[in-house]
Swiss-Prot record:
Specifically methylates the uridine in position 2552 of 23S rRNA at the 2'-O position of the ribose in the fully assembled 50S ribosomal subunit. Its main location: cytoplasm. It comes from the Archaea. It catalyses: uridine(2552) in 23S rRNA + S-adenosyl-L-methionine = 2'-O-methyluridine(2552) in 23S rRNA + S-adenosyl-L-homocysteine + H(+). HAMAP family: RNA_methyltr_E. S-adenosyl-L-methionine binds at G48, W50, D68, D84, D107. The lineage of its organism: Archaea, Methanobacteriati, Methanobacteriota, Stenosarchaea group, Halobacteria. PANTHER family: PRE-RRNA 2'-O-RIBOSE RNA METHYLTRANSFERASE FTSJ3, RIBOSOMAL RNA METHYLTRANSFERASE. Its EC number is 2.1.1.166. This is Ribosomal RNA large subunit methyltransferase E. Belongs to the class I-like SAM-binding methyltransferase superfamily. RNA methyltransferase RlmE family.
Length: 252
């Protein structure tokens, strides 16, 4: 039996609407995405396999919302919105349901043409749509999963996502077909800090941290500056950004 047939048959036996349900299960096992009580938004959710898994993981205390242009048959405990996520009206409906999301997930894929470069470009476009939606909906420290077909534009997409999250990794779940070029960008820890890695700026050192680094505040955000002393006002380059604090080095 092929891997495709195995997951297809398992989905039928276990009541999942698509074999893709196992992709989300494996992504969650690898990256600890959805926890009890989480609010989850699934983009391009039809027919609902990912919604079923997200609902299991978030539990009764969680909130799960699926968005798609196609109708999604009802799933107990899951809200659905029929619409285009790029339109303001659809986003407003979702925000009214969830406020802020803990996790945004997307298994969206383009209609395949068989032309590799075109299919890749369209998949990157859909992944960017998911990324932009996540920036709008995610709570601080929230997570994103977005599917993309591997190709020449994948690295640029990853770099853009990486700038807005604590870290990004790519995962090819076992449930994906062997012949598929699909991979999933898994971005953890939505950053809301006023600085990003690589930024240069002038700061004022107010005091010293426990490890002896200078401490500066940027719009209330704590930046630790190695080798700086209280009273200094150096120009620095940001070297690492965490949800609640970051690190920088002085420029010569």
């Amino acid at each position: 039996m092929t891997r495709k047939d195995d997951y297809y048959n398992r989905a039928k036996q276990q009541g999942y609407r698509s074999r893709a349900a196992y992709k989300l299960k494996q992504l969650d096992e690898a990256a600890d995405l959805i926890n009890e009580g989480d609010t989850v938004v699934d983009l391009g959710a039809a027919p609902g396999g990912w919604l079923q898994v997200a609902n299991e993981l978030a539990g009764e205390a969680g909130t799960v919302v699926g968005v798609d242009l196609q109708r999604i048959d009802p799933i107990e405990g899951v809200e659905t919105v029929r619409g285009d996520m790029t339109e303001d009206a659809t986003r407003e409906k979702v925000r009214a349901l969830v406020g802020e999301a803990d996790v945004v997930i997307s298994d969206m894929a383009p209609n395949m043409t068989g032309e590799y470069s075109l299919d890749h470009a369209r998949s990157v476009h859909l992944a960017r749509m998911a990324f932009e939606t996540a920036l709008d909906l995610l709570a601080p420290n929230g997570d994103l999963v977005a599917k993309v077909f591997e190709g020449p534009d994948t690295d640029d997409l990853r770099a853009d996502i990486d700038r807005e999250f604590e870290y990004v990794r790519t995962i090819h779940p076992d449930a994906s077909r062997d012949s598929s070029s699909e991979l999933f960008m898994v971005a953890k820890g939505r950053l809301t800090a006023p600085v990003r890695e690589g930024d240069t700026l002038e700061v004022e050192i107010d005091n010293l941290g426990d490890e002896g680094d200078g401490v500066a505040k940027v719009d209330g955000y704590t930046l630790f500056v190695s080798g700086a002393e209280p009273g200094d006002a150096p120009e620095v380059r940001v070297t690492d950004v965490k949800p609640r604090f970051g690190f920088a080095e002085t420029l010569e």
